[in-house]
Amino acid sequence: MALEKIIRESLTGFLQCHIAHADLSALDEVFCAYVTGVLEELGSQNSSEEDFEMESFVEMLEGYIPGFSEISSEKVYDMLFELSGRLSEARGTENVSPNPTVEVSFMTPASPSEKTATEPLEGAVAQDKDDPKTGVDLLLEIFPSCTITQAQTALSMAKGDLEDAVQIIVDGKVIADNHSGSKDMQGAPKIEDLKDFILQKYMLVDTEDDKKTYRPVAPKEAPKKMIRYIDNQVVSTKGERYKDIKKPESEEMKKTYINLKPARKYKFH
């Protein structure tokens, strides 16, 4: 992670200096892995400037960052060799691990309390290197329905490789833990009991509404439009103030009407 951070910071500064509006969102893990491989080749003892393929490197970075091909190859060379030197120094500092307790042991004998204090620390360091709990926790985060025993068996089948363990669980090669499932099913309440409990506690039943009879309200009839004057003349001369006048209907419309009155009974003599 420290090496990737160094690469990301140096490339970000280099691009911001030479490309004003550079889109740095493409600097992902794949890009950093490619640049790391190129820098490892440059940092090797057998490599030289003639062996390095600058054109392919520029084409690759042009695909990630538009405008990279406009930067001169000399500046790119200087940046790459400087960055490879920084990475080699960072690797050297990581590989060298100081051990002050050994130097003190030559000068003064360690007390038993110091021994007991250093022993758990050494054990913790050894445990951090190969700690299966971290892999189990990651598997449980990825697969919440997976049990601890299933995650442990998947890690043991994958020999500690997390990606293989994930693939094993996805393929269903891990046998389900029937004992734990049966215990959970025995302790879990039934679905019908849960439904009754929820309905009894939270449902509001309006019993009075069931007793009422529904009587729909009759639609309101529009009042008839009464007319008093037509063409500035009184409609009726019988003393009515207003009168309802029906619109004249055509003969075709009258033919469509049906007479529902019973026919007259004629008596024949």
Swiss-Prot record:
Cystine crosslinks: none
Family (UniProt): Belongs to the CUEDC2 family.
PTMs per UniProt: Phosphorylated.
Sequence intervals crossing the membrane: none
Subcellular location: Cytoplasm; Nucleus
Main location: cytoplasm
Chain ranges of the CUE domain: 131-174
Protein name in the entry: CUE domain-containing protein 2-B
Keyword Cytoplasm appears in the UniProt entry: yes
InterPro entries xref list: CUE_CUED2 (IPR039805)
Function summary: May play a role in targeting proteins for ubiquitination and subsequent proteasomal degradation.
Keywords carried by this UniProt record: Cytoplasm, Nucleus, Phosphoprotein, Ubl conjugation pathway
Organism domain of life: Eukaryota
PANTHER family: CUE DOMAIN CONTAINING 2, CUE DOMAIN-CONTAINING PROTEIN 2
Segments for region (Disordered): 110-130
One GO cellular component term: cytoplasm
